[in-house]
C-alpha cells in the first residue's frame, strides 16, 4: 500500500504524499514499528503544532506589529477570518466526535484527501477538518433525505 501511495504521489507531483510514503516505508523497512503507534497517537498534534508554528513566525520574528494585527482584525476580511476560525473549530469538534463514533471513516477521509491532493491540487491539513465537513454533509443528507 505504501508503494502505491508513493507512486500516486510521484505521478501527481505531490511532494507531501511522496515524503510521507517514503518516511513510512523507511520506518517499516527498518522495523521501528513503535514509531507507528507514536505517530498514530500524536502525529496529528505534532503536525498541527508545526503548522501553528509556521503561521506564528511573523509574530515571533517581529515582521507583524501589534498595530498591523489590530488593523487587520478590524478590517472586513479580518472579521471574516475570525468568523472562519470560529466555524473551523466548530467543524473540527464535529469531526472529532465523528471519528470517535466511527473510527473506520478515516479510510474514506484518507482516500478523499489523496484524491483531493492528486486531482484538485489540494493540501491536506488534517483529518479533523475533513471529518468535520463529512459530519456536516451527513447532517445535511439527513435533513434533505427524501
From Swiss-Prot:
The keyword rRNA-binding does not apply. The chain crosses the membrane at residues 6-26, 46-66, 69-89, 105-125. Signal peptide: none annotated. It is a multi-pass membrane protein. It is found in: Cell membrane. GO terms for cellular component: plasma membrane. Keywords: Cell membrane, Membrane, Transmembrane, Transmembrane helix. InterPro entries: UPF0756_TM. It comes from the Bacteria. Its main location: membrane. Belongs to the UPF0756 family. PANTHER family: UPF0756 MEMBRANE PROTEIN YEAL (PTHR38452:SF1). This is UPF0756 membrane protein PTH_1817. It comes from Pelotomaculum thermopropionicum (strain DSM 13744 / JCM 10971 / SI).
Amino acid at each position: 500500500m505504501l508503494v502505491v501511495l508513493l507512486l500516486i504521489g510521484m505521478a501527481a507531483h505531490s511532494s507531501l504524499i511522496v515524503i510521507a510514503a517514503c518516511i513510512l516505508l523507511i520506518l517499516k523497512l527498518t522495523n521501528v514499528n513503535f514509531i507507528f503507534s507514536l505517530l498514530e497517537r500524536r502525529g496529528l498534534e505534532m503536525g498541527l503544532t508545526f503548522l501553528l508554528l509556521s503561521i506564528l513566525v511573523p509574530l515571533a520574528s517581529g515582521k507583524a506589529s501589534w498595530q498591523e494585527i489590530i488593523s487587520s482584525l478590524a478590517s472586513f476580511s479580518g472579521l471574516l477570518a475570525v468568523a472562519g476560525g470560529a466555524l473551523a473549530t466548530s467543524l473540527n469538534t464535529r469531526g472529532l466526535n465523528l471519528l470517535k463514533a466511527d473510527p473506520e471513516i478515516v479510510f474514506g477521509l484518507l482516500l478523499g484527501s489523496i484524491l483531493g491532493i492528486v486531482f484538485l491540487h489540494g493540501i491536506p491539513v488534517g483529518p479533523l477538518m475533513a471529518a468535520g465537513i463529512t459530519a456536516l454533509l451527513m447532517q445535511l443528507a439527513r435533513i434533505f433525505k427524501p
